[in-house]
Amino acid sequence: MAARLRTKYKKEIVPELNKKFKFESIMQVPRLEKIVLNVGMGEAHTNPKALEAAVEELALITGQRPVKTKAKKSIAGFKIREGMSLGCMVTLRGDYMYEFLDRLVNVALPRVRDFKGVNDKGFDGRGNYNMSIKEQIIFPEIKVDKINTLYGINMTFVTNSKSNEEALSLLAAFGMPYRNQK
């Protein structure tokens, strides 16, 4: 069975955006292509168990096994060597992407303390949106008593839209709660 947001996109969001922006073809309507989640851990080179825990927790959150990211260069000031594992990342596409977005918008973000909406200034000018969360414990899959370290997660929402306005409308139609929404 297809993800709930995928069917919502096909049945509701595409006609709505097509009407709003007056595209010539239905293929010009912006769509979400992938979501990339990245965790960078500074203490990963001194505490490898923290990185393993982050990999396991990111796998729980996304339903997909993350890949460890390695240092490209040695930096003596930070005591890291080339090839050391410093974080992990996962790229979500298809049903995994829509399921994660559904859980993020409807379950995780409302659990953030004093949440007023996400910032709408995270667009890069090409229709991609970047945001981060400060703690991984907002996801219900993470058991608070089992975690050792808190870390943030950077998220990039990659769309095929040409402008920030189109991407903002797309993500808002998916239910992303923006702070300064009109």
Swiss-Prot record:
Gene Ontology BP terms: translation
Gene3D superfamilies noted in UniProt: 3.30.1440.10
Pfam family, one: Ribosomal_L5
Transmembrane segments: none
Keywords annotated in UniProt: Ribonucleoprotein, Ribosomal protein, RNA-binding, rRNA-binding, tRNA-binding
A single MF term (Gene Ontology): tRNA binding
Family matches, as InterPro entries: Ribosomal_uL5 (IPR002132), Ribosomal_uL5_bac-type (IPR020930), Ribosomal_uL5_C (IPR031309), Ribosomal_uL5_CS (IPR020929), Ribosomal_uL5_dom_sf (IPR022803), Ribosomal_uL5_N (IPR031310)
Top-level lineage group: Bacteria
Signal peptide residues on this chain, from the entry's feature table: none
Gene Ontology CC terms: ribonucleoprotein complex; ribosome
The keyword Ribonucleoprotein belongs to this UniProt entry's keyword annotation: yes
Its job: This is one of the proteins that bind and probably mediate the attachment of the 5S RNA into the large ribosomal subunit, where it forms part of the central protuberance. In the 70S ribosome it contacts protein S13 of the 30S subunit (bridge B1b), connecting the 2 subunits; this bridge is implicated in subunit movement. Contacts the P site tRNA; the 5S rRNA and some of its associated proteins might help stabilize positioning of ribosome-bound tRNAs.
PANTHER family for the chain: 60S RIBOSOMAL PROTEIN L11-RELATED
Family classification: Belongs to the universal ribosomal protein uL5 family.
Subunit: Part of the 50S ribosomal subunit; part of the 5S rRNA/L5/L18/L25 subcomplex. Contacts the 5S rRNA and the P site tRNA. Forms a bridge to the 30S subunit in the 70S ribosome.
Protein name: Large ribosomal subunit protein uL5
Gene that encodes it: rplE
